[in-house]
Amino acid sequence: MLQQFCLWKWLAVGIAVATILASSLAQNDEDCKLARTGPPATIVPIDEESRNGTILVDNMLIKGTAAGPDPTIELSLKDNVDYWVILDPISQRLYLNSTGRVLDRDPPMSIQSIVVQVQCVNKKVGTIINHEVRIVVRDRNDNSPQFQQQRYYVAVNELTPVGTTIFTGFSGNNGATDIDDGPNGQIEYVIQYNPNDKTSNRTFDIPLTLSGAVVLRERLNYEEKTRYFVIVQANDRAQNLHERRTSTTTLTVDVLDGDDLGPMFLPCVLVNNTRDCRPLTYQASLPELTDPVHVNPISVTPPIQAIDQDRNIQPPSDRPGILYSILVGTPEDYPQYFHMNLTTAELTLLKPINRDLHQKFDLVIKAEQDNGHPLPAFANLHIEVLDENNQKPYFTKSTYEGFILESSPVGTTISDSRNLTSPLQITVLDNDVEETKDPQLHLFLNDYNTFFTVTQSGITRYLTLLQPVDREAQQLYTFSMIASDGVQESTPVTVNIVVIDANDNSPTFSNISYNVKIYTDMGPGEGVIKLTAVDADEGPNGQIVYEILAGDQGDFIINDRTGLIAIAPGVVLSVGRSYALTVKASDSAPPAQRRSSITTVYIEVLPPNNQSPPRFPQLMYSLEVSEAMRTGAILLNLQAFDREGDPIRYLIENGDPQQVFNLSQSSGLLALGKPLDRESTDRYILIVTASDGRPDGTSTATVNIVVTDVNDNGPVFDMFLPKNLSVQEEEANAFVGQVRATDPDAGVNGQVHYSLANFKNLFRITSNGSIYTAVKLNREVRDYYELIVEATDGAVDPRRSTLTLAIKVLDIDDNSPVFTNASYSVLVPENLPPGTVFLQIEAKDVDLGSNVTYRIRTQEALEYFALNKYTGELSLLKSLDYESFSDTDATFTFLVEAFDSKGTMPPGLATVTVRVKDMNDYSPVFSKTLYRGMVAPDAVKGTVITTVSAEDQDPPGTPASRVRYKVDVVQFPYSASIFDVEENSGRVVTRVNLNEEPSTVFKLVVIAYDDGDPVKFNTTTVEIAVLQPSVIPRFTQDEYRPPPVSESAPKGTVVTVVMAAALNQTIVYSIVSGNEEDVFAINNRTGVISVKKPLDYERVTSYELRVQADSLQVVRSNLRVPSKSNTAKVFIEVKDENDHAPVFTKKMYIGGVSEDAKMFSSVLKVKADDKDTGNYSAMQYRLIIPPIKDGKEGFVIEAYTGLIKTAMLFKNMRRSYFKFQVIATDDYGKGLSSKADVLVSVVNQLDMQVIVSNVPPTLVEQNKDQLIGILERYVQDQIPGATVVVESIGARRFGDGYSEEDYTKSDLMVYAIDPQTNRAIMRNELFKFLDGKLLDINKEFQPYLGQGGRILEIRTPDVVANVKKQAQAVGYTEGALLALAVIIILCCMPAILIVMVSYRQRQAECAKTARIQMALPAGKPASTAANNLYEELGDSTILFLLYHFQQSRGKKSVLEEGDRQRVISSFASRAIEAHKQSNINGSLNNNLPKSSSNITFLSDENPLTTQNPLYVEGVTQSPAAAGLLRKRSDALDTLSPMQLVLRDASLGGSHRAWTVPAHVTKRHAPGSLSRPVIMDPVQWQQERLKAENEGTENQHSRVDISSPLFQKISGPTLTVKEKARQFEQQALQEMKQVKSPDVKSTRSPTHSICLQERDNTLEQSPKSVFASPCLRSSPLSSPTPCEVVEPEPSAVPSVIITHHDYPEELSPPPTRKPTPPSFRIKKPVCQSFLAPQTKGEVTENIPDPPKTPPPPPPLLPPPPPSPPLLPPHPPTLPLASVPSSSSLPSTQHLSPAKHSKSPAKQPAVPPPAAVPEPPPRRELKGILKNIQNLAAIEKSVANMYSQIDKNHVLPKHISKLKPVATPELPTPEAAAEHNQQNGNLSCVVEELEKRFPSQSTAL
């Protein structure tokens, strides 16, 4: 046993080991394999230029472990070229190895992929597996495009058409290249804006951006611009626009001059701002009867010359010559007298002209080009024929006297009077010339010709001033004047010119100042000194007036005429006083021209005897002397005064070492002795002495003389600066050199300014003398400049000096070689041997040191031609054969280019056209060697006799193959004189009218020749026989005019019959002309002409046939004999038939009509054309249109004009459209018809745009169709087939509200209609279509709007703009309303404050009234007590109820009071019973669930129970929210599902029972309010009948319907107190409405808190069921039944109010059974409303109550007293007793389905808790002592008040409603119980009356 156990144990161990080994071996086999699926190779992408260490493969996913103590695999890299990859074997990760290098996919590295092998060695098994890793290098856009050349060049002729490709140099490898790959390497070319050449980007374009072909976009004009610099940008096509790289180059486009302008006559005076010349008239004059030899060529002024405006056509040999001619002239026989040389324009006289016949010639001369493209120019030539010069010129006067003001400027005309108002007219005539014409005389002055000159043209001449005159120098100029006509001279006349004085001289004193000594013994009036001033003028200008200006101090006076200064009267002189009088001398000229000067008189008062030394008037004298002062000029009077009068001697003691000044020793006058030079000495200080010869008789004075500067020195250039300068061409603002100049003068006279005297447009100089180039210089235009620099100082009359600089322009390689001809054309004869040189081309490079080489650029031409690269000789490589080419292509055209071997500029290009000349190989060959013909002896000129024909075997279309004919005049000259052959057709005709003898035979030799080179020819002979007249038939009529033939005439219809007669001859008829289309046929024997082919009047209206009659003998010989008699004309008229239907000009007419269009407004005009004529083309139009509105057609059409008009109004029909058909019938509606479609779309100004142009509306109206066509084309570019319609054309409207009009501009209002949508295109879209193309539209509008006419803007119509403006602005009415609202709010603020204060007062009264104590008998217990009623209602509610109760008691009738007492008693009993259930041990149990009891106002029909939303938890319908619904809904007439019958219509309402539930438990809400129930009226009645049959057994299972009256409304939910306060507010509002005298009918119950206006009794019921349908707030919806929830059996008993005390006569029997509810919409009166709804699902969710309290309710004043509505003592109705809860009969309820959910069970009542001792309170008296928990009773009473009819106003007429099912009568026990409760209620009321009398709480 043990052995077996060991055996089995070892066997198990072996099996385990084997299993482990097997699994290990299997695992080893999987190592080195990939752990992933998919392809074996690993492919990863990587961007080029990735950084070193970038992870290539995160994990190779190779099975096995390469790390650890026992690795299973070993990894390594193989084929790792350049070691780009690094392997981490542990993590199986691959890295990029780019250390010290960059992974670049682009050349030169060009690494596009890297392939390595990851080798895996299985260390367990030993197998090796290689895993391929392929790394794809992705391209990055890291290279910019690179152009192969820095610049590109192309030359374009200005006549190149727009759209021509002018440059393809960017194609291939010549453009830009990008070494990137894919889109990064693809190149696009675009033209960029060049700020230095602003028109280049719009002149050229690259439409195909990938090809780079430059296309001409705008027309070139060599005269405006000769070169363009086009910036071409090359960019790659990277996907990300921001990553695209670009580079630019410049394409230089030279515009070549083309022959687009004609000649122009010189001289050309341009019209302002144009290139047009003003009309030019050449003048010439010829003496009469002059021999042409003496005057030829005629002298013309100016010489006639015209030049071609295209002055630079290359090569010069292509420039056209100019041909001159006289186009037209008057008189018409001018060609007899004049001839103009065709090339030189020399005018020659052909014969003498008699002036009696012709006095003048007015000719129009023409100059045109000689190249077949004339482009003529015109000028006028006026030639005067002069009378024979045998009369002397003569003046009309013998003496002329003129006047001129001496101050007149040069050029003034001499006047004929002293007032200088009119010029002096010198009239000179010559009797050889008409008096009205200029005699063209020359006038000469024999003297004073440097002062005066005379005009040299016209009959009247004028003398003008050449230089100023001075009257003071010479007052009268007298000279003689002679007139000469070149042959004879006139008699001299005398001319006296009087110079009128001008006030040009000022009065001058002899001295600058005067010194006078006077003595104290001199008396008043005694003279002191007499001053004299001199004025050279005459008259008032020379009369001098003196006056003392200052310094006299009132002691001296002066005579204004004599200048005598005397002592003033009454003056006593004092010794030692001195005076300095300033005296002015003025002339008597007018004040504006008056001149004056002043002097100073120094007066010193001395005693009668004086022994003192001489004294100078001043110790210091200061004066300024100009350095230009003349020598000898008196500078200063230094006269001293000596009292004794001793002689004084004056000397200069110091300060004048060079003796520049002279001082008179005796007079003291200081004069200038030598010239002054400020630049050497600018100041002198002289010490002057005066001595009388006595000791101490010397005094001194100092004279300070400042030498002022004059501009006597010019600027001097620095000659050490270089004057030979150089500058490189093609550089703007390049520095050229520097100059410097100095001026020794002072101030502005020494300030130096530089300027250039020449080449100012090429160079500029700065203020410091630096010279720069102003523009780029072109050495090829000019390589050397002598620039003159001028330096000026700053003086008024500046001095100048100049310096000449030599500037050499240095060359750069900036020009390509230019061929002497832009194109070469050569004619090469065929069959020339190879090597023949047939053309030499030449190109020149204006750059220095250039060597030009040539080559053929077109590869195809290299097969035939060779070009010597140095000489430019073109030669043949092989012989050319003309016949080897096609008929039209025997021409080679290829490009040759010239290179500058050392330069970098693009090559010059030229076009060579080689035309192979066909050599004439064959001669023409006639078809016959002999031709015969016959002719009548009287044949007229041009009669065709026969036709010769020859052919040439040369290639067709070549000149060598063209055959022409002529007559050999050498052989048979007479025959050649009467017969001829037509050159091209070969027809032999008579040259003259024949008159030959019959039977004569003539021979004529005809030559056929070609136009080949050389010309080859051949001859043939023609024999012409003249027939006898008798054998020639003669027609009976020369013309036949048959009746018109209908165009529908069938074939064979006879047209007419022609007849001819001949002697013994059989006549054969034929049609010889006019029947080219073979329309008619003639019977050759009978002469009957018939129709052969159908006629078409629309194509040919008439035929003119020429028929010929010949004898049968002649016909048989295949000849014809035309003569005068054997031919006749047949005129056949074709009669039109109505064989063409009308054709409309369009298949569909599209138009529009405005919404505000009036009746019969024009919409559009249709037109149909008919090829027929007459009435057959007269149209009648009609419409096929279905009725549009009220059975009327919307449009009508004028029957004969096609004008469609409106027949209805289209108001508010925008975006509508109408489609109909128009039918056109010709022959005024009796003929053929055709139809077209018409589309009319209704638009308004919202669809329109206004096109404002600067031309008048009339011009727009005239060109409306053309302008609309242009607009339509641009709109159709966006929307094919669109039509543009004109709405109106008027004056431009502008200003505020577009109320102003400008008739110089126009508004064109248009809109466009889309044929796809049949509606107007949106206004914004139309604006985009037109505004984006405004420039192009203006270009096309230009021919129609005139010069300068254009579109100014495109805007929206003024109506749309005004609507927008009005929508943005608040009107005055709105503003006034807003202001009124603000005022009302401000006025309401005091009222709000009063309400708040009153509310506080009411709260205080509420607290007092709440302490009312009342004792009531015990009621019957109920199943569930009401809980927390006091807290739920709040003190405000109690206050309101008491207030309302007291007001009602005091103002209502006895009947109303009794009803109210019964209600209160019954309600109070129920409240106490409910209170006892919630009272445990005298305390209020707050943990019990809230009551679900109901208070129901019951009508005499089935009670309908509803919940009171005031106490329902979670209901969001607050009075505020209900107010929202009231705004959105209408009140319903009834909510009951029964139709009631009322006796009086004034009684409103449905008399339904409405139950106000106290509260619904939270857990009841989901089941009662969220479950939808759908019930229609039929289902409702069935359910109702079913509920009636259930009886009392189902009483406990009936459901209590939760009120679904309110839908879920977003907003805050309210607490119970807040709801109570809002309920109070609502009750006050309803009371006010009910008591208002306006209310005519009772309100229907539309809200759970709305009270029925009827009298009710209280009845206790265990439960009541709500059976009213739930309605939504929509006023248009129907009632929808809601789900009914069955309450628990222990539901709170309800207090039921039933009718009582109503007379039976007021309750009529029912007239019909109740029906489902009908609704009547009326004004809402309740807080919330229910709206009808057809059928729907109602789901309500009651949210949680809000946390924010509502605002306090407004306080209302007490309602006014209402009169009683019933008699004071009405009979009472029998009262039903209230049964007990166990025996209460079933009332009429509507109980829906039994599946309604039941509420959850109520929680258990907790055990009583210890109640703390209440605070002390006032001792109660009487019955109130026995009432426990008085507070709870007070709350019950308050609840009672809230449910009483607050608006207890009985209606005037009450109709008692009959219930559907009579309710069971109450039992006697129930009645007794009810009576007992009524009695108790009376006691309660009496006790309340005693304890709390009624009080008013008026606000």
From Swiss-Prot:
Tissues in which the protein is found: In the utricle, localizes to the distal region of the kinocilium and near the tips of the stereocilia.
Gene3D superfamilies the UniProt entry points to: 2.60.40.3430, Cadherins (2.60.40.60)
Function of the molecule: Calcium-dependent cell-adhesion protein. Required for inner ear neuroepithelial cell elaboration and cochlear function. Probably involved in the maintenance of normal retinal function.
Gene Ontology process terms (BP): cell adhesion; homophilic cell adhesion via plasma membrane adhesion molecules; inner ear development; sensory perception of sound
Classification of source organism: Eukaryota, Metazoa, Chordata, Craniata, Vertebrata
Species annotation: Gallus gallus (Chicken)
Membrane-topology annotation of the record: Single-pass type I membrane protein
SUPFAM superfamilies for the chain: Cadherin-like
Compartment(s) of residence: Cell membrane
Coiled-coil zones: none
Record protein name field: Protocadherin-15
Sequence ranges of Pro residues compositional bias: 1706-1717, 1743-1773, 1804-1814
GO molecular function, one term: calcium ion binding
Region (Disordered): 1668-1687, 1700-1721, 1734-1820
Residue ranges, Cytoplasmic side: 1398-1899
Superkingdom, taxonomy of origin: Eukaryota
Pfam families: Cadherin (PF00028), ECD (PF18432), PCDH15_12th (PF23206)
Domain Cadherin: start-end pairs: 38-147, 148-265, 278-395, 396-509, 510-616, 617-717, 719-819, 820-926, 927-1035, 1037-1144, 1145-1259
Signal peptide: 1-26
Alphabetical keyword list: Calcium, Cell adhesion, Cell membrane, Disulfide bond, Membrane, Repeat, Signal, Transmembrane, Transmembrane helix
Biased composition (Low complexity): 1774-1791
Disulfide cross-links: 32-120
Extracellular side: 27-1376
GO cellular component, one term: plasma membrane
Annotated TM spans: 1377-1397
